[in-house]
Amino acid sequence: MALSNASSLSTRSIYGGDLSHRPSNRQSSFTFHPAVNTKPKSVNLVTAVHAAEPARNAVSVKESVASSSSGALKWTPESWKLKKALQLPDYPNANELESVLKTIEAFPPIVFAGEARNLEERLADAAVGKAFLLQGGDCAESFKEFNATNIRDTFRVLLQMSIVLTFGGQVPVIKVGRMAGQFAKPRSDAFEEKDGVKLPSYKGDNINGDTFDEKSRIPDPNRMIRAYTQSAATLNLLRAFATGGYAAIQRVTQWNLDFVEQSEQADRYQELANRVDEALGFMSACGLGTDHPLMTTTDFYTSHECLLLPYEQSLTRLDSTSGLYYDCSAHMVWCGERTRQLDGAHVEFLRGIANPLGIKVSNKMDPFELVKLVEILNPNNKPGRITVIVRMGAENMRVKLPHLIRAVRRSGQIVTWVCDPMHGNTIKAPCGLKTRAFDSILAEVRAFLDVHEQEGSHAGGIHLEMTGQNVTECIGGSRTVTYDDLSSRYHTHCDPRLNASQSLELAFIVAERLRKRRTGSQRVS
């Protein structure tokens, strides 16, 4: 996989300057000082311009970011502390927090800079229709469900989906997991109440516990160390699966044929599955046998929301090859809907790291605000650096997305447009559990593809909360999950996920849509 082309990294290059002058409106939970209060070391400080290499068609928007507070501040891995930080936990023991962060700073990187650069190049292809992004995995990874079987099953379904999408679109599919680090979750409410008892909300296993008691809900910095070790172990297993023969195309194709045979809509998917199988036979006859590396290995990347900034900073390293800083907790990180403030701490941190970045966008996003945010994060307009992940429901998608596309196009910015059909379709079932309807998810994907056809832009991919397990969290699909079924296998720690069958069914439908668009046929109804 691409994970083998790693660039060398220097040791940690984060200086320990005095930040006692920072504004008082920053969350007090992160008021920690270096043990030795010295002048900043002489390092290659990264500005927003240095975060991404100059592109040929660099452009500016109406308001130059240089005049904004983000542009005026010299970036360092800890300059985010000078900004207002939302959604961060309030750790009760600052000394314990500092000790944990220093421990993580001494750990090896989880991913390497060269791998992140490879992903950025692939995403640049998706921006112009030469590739398609498949990004999927847990809403929130957990410590309790961490085992090789769960990792393998999710990886397997992503492989199956990628084969189907590759054949339908006739372009490479970029496989990126919401895995090996997707723990922290932003919450709408800081507290939750049950039976008259009010406690802090569960914010992810790397912050606090989901058990509803006072001890579990206290943020514990030591959970970050466990999250690091679980992420490293997960990625180690993913590397083995990707390069050790498990990802062989012939094996994955047989899995898809088995799925089709067991599907209630077998006739709908049989033709596509058989065509993939025939294509493999043709390739084998031409001499590209099943033992060729192209047929037995695959590239796989990891991603998560950049939410817990102290953890992300502690894994930020100066790459000795490029002279740029990379957040080595994942190949790609994204900024969530609740933390994308132009003058906020999360945007400040993200603008200085060289990883490919995602921006989650709902129907609340103003087109001009999106243009300004992209300019802050990608001032040199480097293709592949910015992926805009749209999440707003089918109806809003048809109304709001065209304005966002037009605003970005007018600015001359290059982004990769991706559809997240999950977050805009969460409802509460009669039994009280959160769920999502498969038909609503599919409707949003179709709306996303329709809008891009109408606007003459490129639909760059899909972003899904999904699992390889046979859970019953989203209703619908060909193997129908009903409201009555939800409680039987409802295992999510946060939001409902598509199960393996629903995920693969969605991939077949999207692949057929991509194939018909490619061949100039009528749209799928």
Swiss-Prot record:
GO terms for cellular component: chloroplast; mitochondrion. Keywords: Amino-acid biosynthesis, Aromatic amino acid biosynthesis, Chloroplast, Plastid, Transferase, Transit peptide. InterPro entries: Aldolase_TIM, DAHP_synth_2. GO terms for biological process: amino acid biosynthetic process; aromatic amino acid family biosynthetic process; chorismate biosynthetic process; response to wounding. The keyword Protein transport does not apply. PANTHER family: PHOSPHO-2-DEHYDRO-3-DEOXYHEPTONATE ALDOLASE 1, 2, PHOSPHO-2-DEHYDRO-3-DEOXYHEPTONATE ALDOLASE 1, CHLOROPLASTIC. Belongs to the class-II DAHP synthase family. It catalyses: D-erythrose 4-phosphate + phosphoenolpyruvate + H2O = 7-phospho-2-dehydro-3-deoxy-D-arabino-heptonate + phosphate. Signal peptide: none annotated. NCBIfam families: DAHP_synth_II (TIGR01358). This is Phospho-2-dehydro-3-deoxyheptonate aldolase 1, chloroplastic. The gene is DHS1. One of its GO terms (molecular function) is 3-deoxy-7-phosphoheptulonate synthase activity. Residues 1-13 have a biased composition (Polar residues). Residues 1-52 form a transit peptide. Pathway: Metabolic intermediate biosynthesis; chorismate biosynthesis; chorismate from D-erythrose 4-phosphate and phosphoenolpyruvate: step 1/7. SUPFAM superfamilies: Aldolase.
